[in-house]
Structures are given as structure tokens and as C-alpha cells.
Amino acid sequence: MIASKFGLGQQVRHQLYGFLGVIVDVDPEYSLADTEIDDAATSETLRGAPWYHVVMEDDDGQTVQTYLAEAQLSWEIPGEHPEQPSLDELAASIRQQLQAPRLRN
């Protein structure tokens, strides 16, 4: 079993670009068919580690979904980010959905 460093709804930073992001899905290993998208995907070590679907905002404030290796991410200090409130709202919404009891028939 592979343990992931980050969880759903957690806010993270891209280590190289510094962009704030929110984890929306986790894969135990690289799972895209096209390895030419990212040089990190060609590394066997990185391919075998967890990969994350992360929603971020680019320099223009546009929302983008990225697929990043665990090694490309760092922890983000919990708290509000007034410069990117939509990412705070997304993170809170995901965490709330994970904690809410599910209705059963």
C-alpha cells in the first residue's frame, strides 16, 4: 500500500512556481497514458509515487487543473488566502463533503 503525503481538500504549493492549489484527487502512481506531457512522468521513481489532480489559478487568475507528482508539491500553511478566495472556498467545500454524513436509502 502506498501512503500519500497530501489529502483531498488540502491546500498545497507548487514547489517550482509557487502557485497555490487544492488537491481534488489522488492516484497511487502515475496513471496518464501520455508520458510526454511532463518530464517528471518519465522518471520511474516519480511514476511509482503518488500523483495528484490539483486545481490551481495561473498568473491571470484562471482556474486550471494540473496533474503533479508528490515531489512537485509542498505543504501550505492553513489559513485564508485573500488573493485567491475561490481556492479557499473549494478546499472548504471538499473537506465539508468528506466530513458530511451520507444519506442512505
Curated annotation (Swiss-Prot):
Keywords associated with the record: Cytoplasm, Stress response
A GO molecular-function descriptor: DNA binding
GO cellular component terms, semicolon-separated: cytoplasm
Major localization listed first in the record, in broad terms: cytoplasm
Localization terms from the record: Cytoplasm
InterPro entries listed in its UniProt record: Hemimethylated_DNA-bd_dom, Hemimethylated_DNA-bd_sf
Cytoplasm keyword on record: yes
NCBIfam families in the record: PRK14129.1 (NF010729), yccV (TIGR02097)
Family to which the UniProt record says this protein belongs: Belongs to the HspQ family.
Function in brief: Involved in the degradation of certain denaturated proteins, including DnaA, during heat shock stress.
Name by which UniProt lists this protein: Heat shock protein HspQ
Protein encoded by which gene: hspQ
